[in-house]
Amino acid sequence: MQQAFHDIKINTNGQGFYDFTKQTISWVDKQKINNGILNINILHTSASLVIQENADPEVLVDLKNFFNKLAPMDNRLYKHTTEGKDDMPAHIKSALTNNQLTLSIKNKKLMLGTWQGLYLFEHRIEKHTRTLSHHLMGE
């Protein structure tokens, strides 16, 4: 079994979805591993990872709006408000989604459906640089 590690940095411009599918595919393609498992972790607690539709951008708009209603930016609702009105809502959204993704790799290809993409889901309203740690294992 072989292993490979890689970090992808994504600069966000505030709340929303940031597609990192192409960066991940490009990195996997350069590895000596043809078949295996890829684990991706986000090294933050106020953003998350999702596999979501990549064909219709309205899906991402609807998801963002849904989560903003589910965890509103209202400091009267929360005790943890250290970093502003989006602080605790960002942690709630992160807890309800994923901080890691696991994907099968077959013949150097990510096993994703036709309309699936890999997204960083930024929950904060300010710009951030997010780190996505990739760990590929296989043969």
What are the residue ranges of the model-derived segments?
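Active-site histidine-anchored catalytic micro-motif
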Residues: M1-E139
